[in-house]
Regions:
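Short alpha-helical "patches" and their helix-cap loops
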Residues: 37-41, 208-216
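Terminal disorder- and signal-encoded targeting elements
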Residues: 1-4, 211-220
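Low-complexity, flexible helical/coil segments
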Residues: 39-49, 123-130, 219-220
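Metal-dependent phosphoesterase core characteristic of DEDDh/y 3'-5' exonuclease domains
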Residues: 29, 87-210
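Short, charged N-terminal helix-start/capping segments
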Residues: 1-17, 113-128
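Conserved non-catalytic scaffold segment of RNase H-like nuclease domains
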Residues: 2-108
Length: 220
C-alpha cells in the first residue's frame, strides 16, 4: 500500500531556542490547511486575502493570538485529520544529521509542556531523496534548496504564489503584521514540497523514502 503524502512546513521568528512558530501549513488531499499566529494582534481577512491569490487550490486559514494557541490547534488538527495511512513529508524537516521543522516544533512543544501531536504518524524527508537521487546541479553548482529543486524537477507555477524572494523575509512579514503574505509563502512551500514528494514517488523505490515513526517513547 502506498501511503498518501501530507506535506507540511513551518515559519518561525528565527532560529534561536526562544524563537517561536508563526505558521504551520499542511497540504492535505482536499487542499491546504494553514495555522498562523498573530502575536496578539488583530488580523481580519487573512483567509479572503489568501483566497484571492490562490485560485486553483482550496486554502483554509485560521488565526491564533499566540504560539500556544497555534500549537494546540495544530495538535487538534493532527489528531482529527492525519491518519496512519498517510505519510507526513517535509523538505529538510528532519534528516539523520539535521533538519529544521521537526526539531523546531519538538522544542517548542517541549518548552510549552504540550503533548507531542505526531503519534502513530509515519514521516519521511523529501530533501535526501531529491539531492541524492536526482540531479539538481545548475550552472555547475549543486542546488538542493526547495525553490530550486522544485523549479528544476517540477517546473510548475507554485513559485508564482510566493511573495518572497527569500524565506528569511517571512520573519519580517510576521513582525510587520503582513500575515496574508506570510501564509501565501507557507502555502507555496507546502505545495512545492508535495510536488517534489510526488515526483519522488514516481521515480524512487519505497525503500529510498526511509520512513520512520514520530511516535515518542513515552506518552506522558
Amino acid at each position: 500500500m502506498v501511503l498518501e503524502q501530507v506535506a507540511f512546513d513551518i515559519e518561525t521568528t528565527g532560529f534561536n531556542v526562544d524563537d517561536e512558530v508563526t505558521t504551520v501549513g499542511f497540504a492535505v488531499p482536499m487542499g491546504v490547511r494553514v495555522f498562523v499566529q498573530t502575536g496578539e494582534r488583530d488580523a481580519p481577512g487573512i483567509e479572503s486575502a489568501v483566497e484571492s491569490e490562490v485560485s486553483e487550490t482550496l486554502v483554509r486559514v485560521s488565526a491564533h493570538a499566540s504560539e500556544s494557541e497555534l500549537l494546540a490547534a495544530v495538535s487538534e488538527f493532527v489528531a482529527e485529520r492525519i491518519r496512519d495511512d498517510m505519510l507526513l513529508v517535509a523538505y529538510n524537516g528532519e534528516r539523520w544529521n539535521g533538519g529544521f521543522d521537526v526539531p523546531f516544533l519538538r522544542t517548542r512543544y517541549a518548552q510549552r509542556d504540550l503533548a507531542w501531536p505526531f503519534v502513530d504518524v509515519p514521516y519521511a524527508d523529501v530533501m535526501p531523496l531529491v539531492t541524492d537521487r536526482f540531479n539538481t546541479t545548475v550552472d555547475g553548482t549543486e542546488q538542493g534548496d526547495l525553490v530550486t529543486a522544485y523549479d528544476v524537477l517540477c517546473d510548475g507555477s507554485y513559485g508564482d504564489l510566493d511573495p518572497f524572494d527569500d524565506s528569511a523575509e517571512a520573519v519580517a512579514a510576521f513582525e510587520d503584521g503582513r500575515f496574508a503574505e506570510l501564509v501565501l509563502h507557507n502555502v507555496a512551500d507546502v505545495l512545492r514540497t508535495r510536488a517534489l514528494g510526488r515526483v519522488a514517488e514516481r521515480y524512487c523505490s519505497k525503500s529510498e523514502f526511509k520512513v520512520k515513526s514520530l511516535t515518542p517513547t513515552r506518552s506522558i
